[in-house]
Curated annotation (Swiss-Prot):
Residues annotated as binding Mg(2+) 3: N219, S223, E227
Keywords recorded for this protein, A-Z: Lyase, Magnesium, Metal-binding
Organism (species): Aspergillus terreus
Binding site for (2E,6E)-farnesyl diphosphate: R314, Y315
GO molecular function list: aristolochene synthase activity; metal ion binding
UniProt protein name: Aristolochene synthase
GO biological process: isoprenoid biosynthetic process
Pathway membership: Sesquiterpene biosynthesis; aristolochene biosynthesis; aristolochene from farnesyl diphosphate: step 1/1
Assembly description: Homodimer.
Role description: Catalyzes the cyclization of trans,trans-farnesyl diphosphate (FPP) to the bicyclic sesquiterpene aristolochene. Produces germacrene A as an enzyme-bound intermediate that is not released by the enzyme, but is further cyclized to produce aristolochene. Aristolochene is the likely parent compound for a number of sesquiterpenoid toxins produced by filamentous fungi.
Region Disordered, residue ranges: 1-20
PANTHER family: BETA-PINACENE SYNTHASE-RELATED, TERPENE SYNTHASE
Amino acid composition bias (Polar residues), ranges on this chain: 1-14
Catalytic activity annotation: (2E,6E)-farnesyl diphosphate = (+)-aristolochene + diphosphate
Length: 320
């Protein structure tokens, strides 16, 4: 088995600029990872043992515990299960056309709502159905608030925008949907039991958008080699290369490695902007205790996403 340079989506020579953000992980990470991984190993149709090992090595529950380190102990497993199944579906979509992927996701939407019963012989259907039913049983109001953000994310995954030429600004706007920022925000609120009013959420829209850029670009930096490999081996539509690394490299006429270094500096600027926007919110007397917890949660999403992206084997490229 050959493992080329650039595993974890970035060459070993890439040294990120220092960050003032410090990641935090949920204290139940080991327990919940074992529980959730065990569930999917039992129920998901992995094609072979190699795929099962790759799934465990990706650490989907770990990234969820880094995203939501202050989730309530009795809710973190819901978040882990939801992000895990969405990651697994995302992998399947790479080998489908946009039309096939859209049909696949659209079939899951009414099942998620509970409007249609699942086919119990199809794991993805009953996993999705059972998960949403259990989340609604725990907190129907907050679970229902996650539905539309999840559907927005699922539809962005198969949006033909991915195949169109985009500048960096247009790309970041698209990725706000594709990276699932609204989904992550709603799932964070659910996992923390954090109820915010529409007016409170309106006050942090700019902070949300800023966080989305950071999440998207950090993922792009570390997943570039994996995405490049996928673009050559997966479906021509589902596996299309759509990344800020490629866009900046082409627009600025620099190498992919140079583009990564520039993008990392931008990420640090977005961190500074996050701090400035949060300080302004407080100075204007608009920060409630709920919003203070929310914007702190966004900071943990950014730092946690970066730590996971640096270390996950999901972004490794392994060639047999």
């Amino acid at each position: 088995m050959k493992k080329p340079n650039g595993t974890n989506g970035a060459s070993s020579s890439l040294e990120p600029p220092p960050s003032t953000f410090q990641p935090l992980c949920h204290p139940l990470v080991e327990e919940v990872s074992k529980e959730v991984d065990g569930y999917f190993l039992q129920h998901w149709n992995f094609p072979n043992e190699k795929a099962r090992k790759k799934f465990v090595a990706a650490g989907f529950s770990r990234v969820t515990c880094l995203y939501f380190p202050k989730a309530l102990d009795d809710r973190i497993h819901f978040a882990c299960r939801l992000l895990t199944v969405l990651f697994l579906i995302d992998d399947l979509l790479e080998y489908m056309s946009f039309e096939e992927g859209s049909a696949y996701n659209e079939k899951l939407i009414p099942i998620s709502r509970g409007d249609v019963l699942p086919d119990r012989s199809i794991p993805v259907e009953y996993i999705i159905y059972d998960l949403w039913e259990s989340m609604r049983a725990h907190d129907r109001e907050m679970a229902d608030e996650i539905l539309e953000p999840v559907f927005l994310f699922m539809r962005a995954q198969t949006d033909r925008t991915r195949a169109r030429p985009m500048g960096l600004g247009g790309y970041l706007e698209y990725r706000e949907r594709d990276v699932g920022k609204e989904l992550l925000a709603a799932l964070m609120r659910f996992s923390m039991g954090l109820k915010l009013s529409p007016s409170e959420l309106q006050r942090v829209r700019e902070i949300d958008a800023n966080c989305s850029k950071h999440l998207s670009v950090v993922n792009d930096i570390y997943s570039y080699e994996k995405e490049l490999y996928t673009s050559k081996t997966a479906h021509s539509e589902g596996g299309i290369l759509c990344t800020s690394v490629q866009i900046l490299a082409q627009e600025a006429d620099v190498t992919a490695e140079a583009a990564k270094r520039v993008l990392f500096v931008m990420c640090r600027e977005w961190e500074l902007r996050h701090q400035l926007l949060v300080a302004r919110l407080s100075a204007e007397g608009l920060e409630t205790p709920g919003l203070a917890a929310y914007v702190e949660g966004l900071e943990y999403q950014m730092s946690g996403n970066e730590l996971w992206s640096q270390t996950t084997l999901r972004y490794s490229v392994v060639v047999d």
